[in-house]
Amino acid sequence: HDTIPNWITYTVSWPPTLKNCLDYQWNEVAIPYWQGLVEQARANGVEKFALENFSSMLVWNPETLFRLRDAVGPMVGLNLDPSHLIWMGADPIAAARALGPAIHHCHGKDVRLERGLVNVNGLLETKPVEDVANRAWNYVAVGCGQDLQWWKEFFSVVRMMGYNDWVSLEMEDLTMSVDAGVTSSIAALQQTISQ
């Protein structure tokens, strides 16, 4: 039995066994598990699940979310974290439009692709987050990766798609103090969240 699944989130074109592994993960593990969990949650008054789109998880982008929703229903939605989509090379604004009412929560979290490093090593990164000087990308205070105009458009589109609820600040910028990062991020969010 899998106790700590390692979800396949990259190409399955080679080696051929990866396609079989991915099919197993979805059809034999994930979908049956989530069908049971949604049924149990509904029986206990839970209305929504918001899964964060992180790279090593089963649901890491709109396409994988919709695959799960098709199997288990709209109770499952996305906790839209734009920072993860950015370092995966996706456009969070386009993703928000595609997600529509499947946005169940939203993070205010930014990322910076590090010039000179991302160009050499690409976006996949396994160095610890503490190794900020050598990583291809780093989590940064809101506004230190994408400018404020970008954030205004992001939150505007999220709201147009029907999400008008909490935005959780995740301050994981290790290039500044926690106090400075929180203060800077709150100031950026106050200027950019659609009221």
List the predicted regions and their residue ranges.
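A structural alpha-helix within SAM-dependent methyltransferase catalytic domains
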Residues: 31, 35-42, 66-69, 100, ...
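Active-site acidic/histidine proton-transfer and metal-coordination neighborhood
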Residues: 1-77
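A short, mixed-charge helix-start or loop-turn motif at secondary-structure junctions
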Residues: 19-23, 136-140, 171
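C-terminal helical cap(s) of enzyme catalytic domains, especially alpha/beta-barrels
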Residues: 178-195
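A general structural motif
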Residues: 44-48, 73-75, 101-103, 160-166
